[in-house]
Amino acid sequence: MKNRNGFSLVELLLVVAVILIISAIAIPNFLRSRERANEASAVASMRLINTAAVTYSVTYSNLGYPVSLTAMGGASPCTASSAQACLLDDVLAQGTKSGYSFALTGDGLVPSVSYLVTGTPQAVGSTGQRMFCTDQNSVIHYDSSGSGCTSASPTLD
């Protein structure tokens, strides 16, 4: 019998099978972790938007709450004005962050007395499972049914 170096085909197939089994277990857990991280980031962004909206309404009391996210943003270096208040980073002010799309809708009044912010996963099941919303009361609600988030939706604990 010859003295051969290396692995046999059976040994290589066993190693590949073990790697595939480990991958089948690890990858779904990784994806769920990423979804949870995106949802946590979305909730933090909603809180930041609420804080910025209140600051905006106090600073520009003649206008009330902002009419859009871009009104609270501004590229760095930023000079504050009612059209670009420099309260949010430019990424969030453009409406996307961590796999979520954000939108702020004002009430159309001057001064504005209410607003609604929504945070929607860009790819449901991949970037997040739940939609979030909040308004001038700063209570964050969520919807995981896909029917849309409203002030009647469950609140976060």
Whereabouts are the PLM-identified features?
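Extracellular/periplasmic head regions of type IV pilus-like filament subunits
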Residues: 51-130, 134-139, 144, 155-157
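Aliphatic-rich helix starts adjacent to a transmembrane/signal segment
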Residues: 29-46
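A short, glycine- and basic residue-enriched loop/turn
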Residues: 4, 19, 34-37, 53
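N-terminal hydrophobic or amphipathic segments with adjacent small-residue motifs
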Residues: 11-18, 36, 113, 132
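Alpha-helical interaction segments
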Residues: 19-21, 46, 90-92
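N-terminal single-pass transmembrane signal-anchor helix
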Residues: 2-30
